[in-house]
Amino acid sequence: MSVNHYSTDHHHTLLWQQQQHRHTTDTSETTTTATWLHDDLKESLFEKSLTPSDVGKLNRLVIPKQHAEKYFPLNAVLVSSAAADTSSSEKGMLLSFEDESGKSWRFRYSYWNSSQSYVLTKGWSRFVKDKQLDPGDVVFFQRHRSDSRRLFIGWRRRGQGSSSSVAATNSAVNTSSMGALSYHQIHATSNYSNPPSHSEYSHYGAAVATAAETHSTPSSSVVGSSRTVRLFGVNLECQMDENDGDDSVAVATTVESPDGYYGQNMYYYYSHPHNMVILTLL
């Protein structure tokens, strides 16, 4: 008779693996939390859509003057003093930024008297190549809320706008579609002597059928060839002519009219079996 002994080494191995898994999970959660807090501590400064010259061979990014003077002010002597040396103002200073991965980027920031513009020069072309930036892409700048010396730089592709604008566009499209559907669900006319031909509305069959399923509740009472349908709070009796070869049958029903629809006929069509219901509003 053989006895299998539980290996002590195996027990220690399992215990070590469990501890490692717990440590990895805790580290991942801590990193995620730290990243979230880090992003929350960033203050957005400004952004700029890149021009062809910004990503071209000129090796420079033009910073809009209002943003440059507000967030990256150079020494006032270098910019505004009449006695300032042009070479000193164009030499400028070095600015350090962190990208989304934490990598540090250093750019020379200066003021060009010739074009009267603030620019990032040395080091900019490396950033363009590393991120593979193209004209129309957007770069944005941020600053740490509690440590103003920490600056951040980020970027996004052209056309990647905010979700709110996309949601607003989708909402407008949906509203427009519902308006068009409502118009074709019910067609009201004043004192028609003859109802419109079925072919005039046949291409609206699918939309109207959907509306009928949504807004009407069919009754379980079906006697012979008649069918009772409740539509918009009104019980309608649809007479089906079984001997008629034409699948388009018009049925007239007199109901109490809402305000503003006195003496009007309302025509309602189904896609299958292509019946038309005429509501005479009193």
Swiss-Prot record:
Residues 46-159 bind DNA. GO terms for molecular function: DNA binding; DNA-binding transcription factor activity. The keyword Transcription applies. SMART domains: B3 (SM01019). Gene3D superfamilies: DNA-binding pseudobarrel domain. GO terms for cellular component: nucleus. Keywords: DNA-binding, Nucleus, Transcription, Transcription regulation. This is B3 domain-containing protein At5g06250. It comes from Arabidopsis thaliana. The lineage of its organism: Eukaryota, Viridiplantae, Streptophyta, Embryophyta, Tracheophyta.
